[in-house]
Design a protein with these regions (language model features):
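Short aromatic/hydrophobic-glycine micro-motifs
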Residues: 22-26, 86, 149
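A conserved amphipathic terminal alpha-helix motif
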Residues: 124-148
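Long, continuous compositionally biased terminal/linker segments
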Residues: 42-71
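Short, internal acidic amphipathic alpha-helical interface segments
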Residues: 60-113
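Short amphipathic alpha-helical segments that mediate assembly, nucleic-acid/protein binding
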Residues: 10-13, 74-77, 120
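Charge-rich, low-complexity N-terminal segments
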Residues: 1-53
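A short acidic/glycine-rich loop-to-helix N-cap element
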Residues: 114-128
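Short, highly charged C-terminal tails/helix-capping segments
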Residues: 142-168
């Protein structure tokens, strides 16, 4: 949303916030930006969920790692993530994976439309999709970002390709 948000948008945002508080969600609110951050966890890790509402009846949900992608693996992992997004057959074109270089974090980002559902199912559906996408790749990215890469220096002894010309 922007500064020119309608009364309906403001009421909808406030109603969602109240619903989440009623469900005991711990929220860090930014009412001027129509956004909030909360902590999410599974049995393996904790991460942040950032939700930002926009003025065109859509919102963005980001699951963001609390662990850091190390500098030496940042570019390598970012390239791999871009390939995952390109070749992801299960994608519904609402959610993508990303590396935020500034924060050095792994993210799953979901764009969705704000609905008129009294039970806020539009939000919880996007939340479920986003956290499932995040969890599906998080362990792999975390492990890949902590390993060093070693290169084999091929010699005549360990090369799969013959080092000398073979005569017929």
């Amino acid at each position: 949303m922007s500064l020119a948000a309608s009364d309906r948008d403001i009421e909808g945002f406030n109603a969602l916030i109240q619903e989440l508080k009623n469900r005991d969600w711990d929220l860090l609110l930014n009412r001027e930006e129509f956004a909030f951050i909360t902590a999410v966890a599974n049995e393996h890790e904790k991460w942040e969920l950032e939700v930002q509402f926009h003025d065109d009846s859509r919102f963005t949900t980001k699951s963001r790692s609390r662990w850091v992608v190390k500098d030496e693996s940042l570019n390598r992992i970012e390239r791999a993530i871009k390939r995952f997004n390109f070749y992801d057959d299960d994608s519904n074109d609402r959610t993508i994976w990303k590396i935020d270089k500034k924060l050095q974090s792994f993210e799953a980002i979901t764009e969705a439309k704000v609905g008129d559902d009294v039970d806020f199912s539009y939000f919880f559906d996007a939340f479920d999709e986003n956290t499932n996408y995040y969890q599906s790749l998080s362990d792999t990215v975390r492990k890949a970002s902590t390993i060093g890469i070693e290169y084999n220096h091929f010699s005549e002894k360990n090369s799969l390709i013959p080092q000398r010309t073979i005569k017929n």
